[in-house]
Each structure stands twice: as structure tokens, then as C-alpha cells.
Amino acid sequence: MDRSLWAVMGGTFTLRFSTGLTGAMLAVYLAKLPEHGGPVVAATTLALLHATFYLSELVLSPVFGVLSDRLGHHRVMLFGPVFGAVAVILTGLTTNLTILGGTRLLEGASTAASVPSILGYIALATATSEVLRGKAAARFEGATLAGFGVGFAAAPLLFAAFGPVAFYLNAVVYGVSFLIYRFGVEDHDREERAVAATARASRMDLSRYGALLRTSHVWLLAPTWIAVNASIGLWFSQSIFQFSQANPNFPDQVLHRGFSAVEISLTAVVVGILFGIGLLYWGNRFKNLRRTTIILYGIIGGGILVAGGVAINHGAGLPFAVPVGGVLAAAFGLFVLAGATPAALGLLADISERFPTDRGAIMGLYSVFLAVGQIVGSLIGGFAAEWRGIDGLLLATFALLLVALVPLAQLRRQEHYVGGPSQAASLGDVETAP
């Protein structure tokens, strides 16, 4: 990867760090809001504020995707850090819940502006190389995961040390992201932007999304990716809450005995490392494996993960080999599941090759699918956990993975029609790869 792509990855890490840091610190801030002169915050209010972020990302990603095609991916990716910095400064200044809701909308706008433009830039920069596209997709997902993880881990310590002032420090990190994008990333899309300008009317035409969404490949990819995101998202929303306290309603489930914060944190670190290794491994297999093959492997890996989780959750009283085997199966399944995310991202980038003047609009669908998946996963996870606890989450995960399989066969049959890197030369390779 060249210097600009590495800078994009570095900026993605710092930007996602700031996003994760804000979200986690806000949860602590709201819990202690009366100490800072604000009202007592109910759990439902916290949930509403959490959903507001994803709603903003869902609605605004198409807007900024189209805008990045008109103004340039490099220019629009600069908007995100600015929105984020304003949002965190306002967050530290107020205890008013309405204003805090507005800051979550602004924070969602930050992500909505950044992600489609970043991914549009990556799609353009990797248009000539299967290997480079695989590496870039995996590293983008890795930078996203690492940024979120470090932000979540640092949030309690920073807020304990600085209080609401920590939000202002986060604005500095947003400033670092802006500087990385401004001076570290070269504007590669001047020529493509000029073509786009002559191809469209002078106004920003969101009706372009209608034509793009009529592409069958998008509709085949959408349910698969949304379902995979939902299967992962339900654990993001429920796992810490479920693991952190004993639940007498499910005495037969080992994972409901209640775990300490240290145990949960160490497990999260191990999960993050395994997922990150999986991202790098499968991201380097784009040249030899079809995108849909890697997605299929990922879904199968998710099924193995579920089976391992069941063995762990019901391993009490059974031979020691059963829970140990469950741990190994879950670890292997997670490693394989990780490949589905860069493969789906790479496939979306391939689809963008058919619409070279609409890369930002196409890649904006990444945020749309992610937001829908997170919202759906959160809702399903809540009902599943109430119904059967960890077993309910495992069953919901398995069901969502089955949903992801349904359109995959048809998508696989049409995959060779999707333009990818070195399109004319490589379509045959794509068809014949395993």
C-alpha cells in the first residue's frame, strides 16, 4: 500500500478511537449526570441516545456518499473530524438531554461523512489490484475494530481522571484525524471528479441511489451483509450486560454465573486479537478465493462459533474435554467468521467498478448496511436474551447466519458479472477460483 492508503488507515484508527471513546464516556457521563447538575437518566433514555447515533448514520450516509462523488472523496472525508470535534465539545459543555441527543446526531453525521468517502477513496485507489484491495479492506476493518476497542478501553480511565474535560481532549484526537486526512492523504480522484461533474446536473441528485439500488447485486449483498452485521451486533449490545451479572433465571447456563470486569476485559482482548488475525488472514486471500467463498466460509465459521458457545455454556458436569473443545471451536469459528467482513466490503468495492462516478454513493451503502444490522441485532438480541439468556443469543446468531445464506447462492452465480480490479483481465479468474 502507498503512503496515502496507510494514512487513510491511520486516520480511520484515530477517528474510530474518538467515536468509541465518546460513546463509552457518554455512558459513564449519563450514569453520573446528577453529579454534574443534570437529571437522572433512565436506561430507555440511554438506549434512545444510542440508537440516535445509528439513525443519523443510516440517514446521512447516502447524502454524504453522493456528495463525495461530486466534491471528491478526499475533501468530504475532512468533514467527519470537524463534525466529531464539535459534537464532543458540546457534549462536555452540557447536561441537557435534548442537546446531548443533538450531539449524538452530529456524531453520527461524522461517521456518515467519513466512511463513504474513505471507502470510495479505497475503492478508487485499489481499482487495479485484487491483492491490494483485499489488504486494504482487511486493514480498514482492522483499523476500525482496533480504534473502537482502544476507545472503549480508555474511556473509563479518562473520564475518571478528567471528568467531562475528557470530551475536550477527544476533540484534540479528532483534530489529529483531520490533519492526517488533510496532509497525509493525496487527492487521487481529481480526474474522476471531473468526469462525474460532466455526467450529472449541477445539483446533488439523491435519485442516483434509486438507480444504484436497482442493481441486483446490491440487493443480493444487502440481506447477507445486514444479517452478518446483526449476528455480530447483537453481541456488542448484550454481551457485557449479560456476562457482568449472575442471572438466577438460567441456572443451567455456565455463562450466566457472572464475571468480573477483569475477566470480561481480558476475554474482549482475546476476542479482538483473534478477530484481527482473521481479518488480516482472509484479507490476503482475495487473489485466490472468490469474495462469496470467503463470505460462505465466514458464515460456516459463525455456525462453528455458535456450536462452541453451546458446549461452553452447558459444559458444567461434563468431561473437561467438552468445554475445552468448545473454547477451541469458538476460537476457530471466530477466526473464520472475521473473513466475511472484508470480503463483503471487497465485493461492494467490486460493484462500485460498474459505477466509477458513483463510488462514494455505492460505498455509502456500507454504513447503511452496518447501521441497519446494528439496529436489528440490538433489537433481536434484547428479546433473545430476555427469552433464553445466552442460549437465546446463540440461537439468534445461528438464525441470522441462516438468513445470510439464503441470497448467497444467487449472489455467487452472478458474482462474475460484478466489475472488480483489473476487470477485463481477471473476470475469468474470478469465475474459476474456488
Locations of regions flagged by a protein language model:
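Paired small-residue
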Residues: 11, 98-107, 324-333
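Residue-level signature of mid-helix packing/kink "hotspots" within the transmembrane helices
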Residues: 50-62, 148-149, 272-280, 374-375
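Helix-to-loop junctions at the C-terminal end of transmembrane segments
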Residues: 59-72, 277-291, 385
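Short amphipathic helix-loop junctions that connect adjacent transmembrane helices
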Residues: 25-43, 237-262, 350
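Cytoplasmic helix-loop-helix junction between adjacent transmembrane helices
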Residues: 103-145
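Juxtamembrane intracellular "pre-TM" segments in multi-pass secondary transporters
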Residues: 1-2, 187-222, 426-434
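Conserved MFS/SLC helix-loop-helix module at the cytosolic interface between two early adjacent transmembrane helices
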Residues: 58-95
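Structural signature of the two symmetry-related core transmembrane helices
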Residues: 75-90, 293-309
